[in-house]
């Protein structure tokens, strides 16, 4: 079968393998590409190609991640696999690889292990909506009752973290068998991908969400008015749309878009991902500054207090050399600007060591446009010391 070109007519989803070290995440990733390439949908990637993950920098943090792409009959997937546990934590907390769903790999020989639990918890915290389970190494377990027990244990764990443990698919197979073309195990890889196709839902694309653009720069065009530039984060900006400008001390300014410019051309509209200049009616250059956010009226509110899941960099990663304590006051770099905030640690936590990940509460000195899932870096004197995302808005 001839290799197809990248086909944009298929819906695109981002997924990844998660689970305990040595349970077979990378072998499974290789097996998926092997089985789907035999079906003519993608190029196979070997274990070594995937395991040898390149370093990437995301919000000042170095993460090793492997990106693989493949297609099923119905969808196109970008799949992320990380070599080390710390890379997973960093990847999920910083959102370096946003996941629309995940494949949880659990070795039947071990059952759920500490990192299995930790990855499910992180998935819940950072909003991975659905999880499909692949029970691996089933060929190494002779006892059918044991397999049943392991599956029950996994389902209980998913339910505990508010996933649908009762109804979610659990596929029992062997990643190595699938990779080695074993006729007993190849169908299980196909069954897994059918489960992924059916269970993991297509996400609402950014364009379909309400309009939001963080302001990067502001200038005046003589005779035409004030222009705010930035990259549209979500939604669409049309000429004639009413907007609000909020955050960083803006007292809910309202305006109307009188023009959208991109690459020095006038357009009717700009959409998520575009770098644009918006011409704003009745707004003075002095009214608006970097760090404010232009939104569809009423869609987002400014907030100053929130809870967040964060990862604190190790010394070797360029982070702090010493722990920090309650009431630590770093800067939070959100979208386009730094805001100072005060960190409150959870009860019973005296201090936070470099390399930790935990839930904190933050009080910012000035409110900013905020929603659950908003990502940020924690900085001190211009260097990144941590990263995270908002899990709950307090006020």
UniProtKB/Swiss-Prot annotation:
Catalytic activity of the protein: GTP + H2O = GDP + phosphate + H(+)
A Pfam family hit: GTP_EFTU_D3
Cross-referenced InterPro entries: EF-Tu_GTP-bd, EF-Tu_GTPase, EFTu-like_2, EFTU_2, G_TR_CS, P-loop_NTPase, Small_GTP-bd, T_Tr_GTP-bd_dom
Residues in tr-type G domain copies: 10-204
Any single GO CC term annotated in Swiss-Prot or TrEMBL for this entry: cytosol
Biological function: GTP hydrolase that promotes the GTP-dependent binding of aminoacyl-tRNA to the A-site of ribosomes during protein biosynthesis.
Protein name as catalogued: Elongation factor Tu
Source organism: Flavobacterium johnsoniae (strain ATCC 17061 / DSM 2064 / JCM 8514 / BCRC 14874 / CCUG 350202 / NBRC 14942 / NCIMB 11054 / UW101) (Cytophaga johnsonae)
């Amino acid at each position: 079968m001839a290799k197809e070109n990248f086909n944009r007519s298929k819906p695109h989803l981002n997924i990844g393998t998660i689970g305990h070290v040595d349970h077979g995440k990378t072998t499974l990733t290789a097996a998926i590409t092997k089985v789907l390439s035999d079906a003519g949908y993608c190029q196979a990637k070997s274990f070594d190609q995937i395991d040898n993950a390149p370093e990437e920098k995301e919000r000042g943090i170095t993460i090793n991640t492997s990106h693989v792409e493949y297609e099923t009959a119905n969808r196109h997937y970008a799949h992320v696999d990380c070599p080390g546990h710390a890379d997973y934590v960093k990847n999920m907390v910083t959102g370096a690889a946003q996941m629309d769903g995940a494949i949880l790999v659990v070795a039947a020989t071990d059952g759920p292990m500490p990192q299995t639990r930790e990855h499910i918890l992180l998935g819940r915290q950072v909003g991975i909506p659905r999880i499909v389970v692949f029970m691996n190494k089933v060929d190494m377990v002779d006892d059918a009752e044991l397999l049943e027990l392991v599956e029950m244990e996994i389902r209980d764990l998913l339910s505990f973290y508010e996933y649908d443990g009762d109804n979610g698919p659990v596929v029992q197979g062997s990643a190595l068998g699938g990779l080695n073309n074993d006729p007993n195990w190849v169908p299980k890889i196909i069954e897994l991908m059918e489960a992924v196709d059916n269970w993991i839902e297509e996400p609402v694309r950014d364009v379909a969400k309400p309009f939001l653009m963080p302001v990067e720069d502001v200038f005046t065009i003589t005779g035409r008015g004030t222009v705010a530039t930035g990259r549209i984060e979500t939604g669409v900006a049309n000429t004639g749309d009413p907007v609000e400008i909020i955050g960083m001390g803006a007292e809910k300014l309202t305006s109307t878009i009188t023009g959208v410019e991109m690459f020095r051309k006038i357009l009717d509209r700009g959409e998520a991902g575009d770098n644009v200049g918006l011409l704003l009616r009745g707004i003075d250059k002095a009214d608006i500054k970097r760090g404010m956010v232009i939104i569809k009226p009423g869609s987002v509110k400014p907030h100053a207090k929130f809870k967040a899941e964060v990862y604190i960099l190790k010394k070797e990663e360029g982070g702090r050399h010493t722990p920090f304590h309650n009431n630590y006051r770093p800067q939070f770099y959100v979208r386009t600007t730094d805001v100072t905030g005060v960190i409150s640690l959870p009860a019973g936590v005296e201090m936070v060591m470099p390399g930790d990940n935990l839930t904190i509460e933050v009080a910012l000195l000035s409110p900013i446009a905020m929603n659950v899932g908003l990502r940020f870096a924690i900085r001190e004197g211009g260097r990144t010391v941590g990263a995270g995302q908002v899990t709950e808005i307090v006020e």
